[in-house]
Amino acid sequence: MRDIKTYLSVAPVLTTLWFGALAGLLIEINRFFPDALAFPFF
């Protein structure tokens, strides 16, 4: 039971950190390469 409680307390923290890092990465990509729906360098 202790392992389940540890998992339930760690998983939300890790997903919050992961989605925060992913959102930051996407924001930085959009800052340096705006309008990425049209890739003009292909």
Curated annotation (Swiss-Prot):
TM annotation in the entry: 7-27
Fetch the InterPro entries from UniProt. PSI_PsaJ, PSI_PsaJ_sf
Task: Provide one Gene Ontology biological process annotation.
Answer: photosynthesis
**Highest taxon of the lineage:** Eukaryota
Family according to the record: Belongs to the PsaJ family.
Q: What task does this protein carry out?
A: May help in the organization of the PsaE and PsaF subunits.
User: What is the recorded name of this protein?
Assistant: Photosystem I reaction center subunit IX
What species was this sequence derived from? Answer: Amborella trichopoda
Gene (UniProt)? psaJ
